[in-house]
Amino acid sequence: MAAKSHRALKITSIVIGVIVGIALIAVVALNIYMRVAFAPFFDRAESPFDIPGINTGFVPQDLDHVEADDSWLFSGYMADHSPSPIYRRAADGTITKFYVSLPDGSPYDGHGSAITTNEQYAYLACEEGYLVIPMDDLLFAEDGASVQAIEKVDVDFSPAFMNIEQGQLLLGNFYYPNDYETPENHHITTPDGTENPAVMYAFAADPAEPGRFLTVPDNVFSIPGMVQGTCITADGRIVLSVSYG
């Protein structure tokens, strides 16, 4: 009986060892593939600093560079669904974590999918719109504090990405079949016959209020699915970054 138990234990150990070995081989193979497939990226990439909060349940979604003081802002959400923080990394490496209160005083617990800034305000994506936060409040917030959003601006979808580029506010939605659907009128067939299932709005600056934007878009761009970022190059070309999973 003891011999049978010993044999069963030995077989189990061998099976577990084989499974672990296969898993390790798969991880190594994946790392090698990633290094080879994305070699041009890794050749040029730098690692200036670690993403703050990454090991505390914080799931980062966006970042923005504040030129005024050379700091970085990180938005995202918490895996445990607690209020969503914003991390600020100062030029000297000091990390500050603070929170955002909605205009009604309730805590912001949104996805934090996008944050972008100009000299006067920070704009933080929320459900069906974005929040407006005075930059002075944000830049001087103490660790653990809460900054007050002065307004929520409504949009007819929840922005998945948002960026201030060349004086205009760009924001768009994210499409992935079944999981992240978009309104039917956002689905447009392009001249080559493919379908773009999402849109990006471009809001012009508000001439009556420095740092703010008009609430009716100047332009609406038809874009592919799975877009999570955008910028405009110096020669006026629009760049879209795509990712999922």
Show where each model-derived region lies.
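Blade-loop segments of beta-propeller domains
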Residues: 85, 93-120
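Loop/turn-rich, solvent-exposed surfaces of beta-rich toroidal or solenoidal domains
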Residues: 220-245
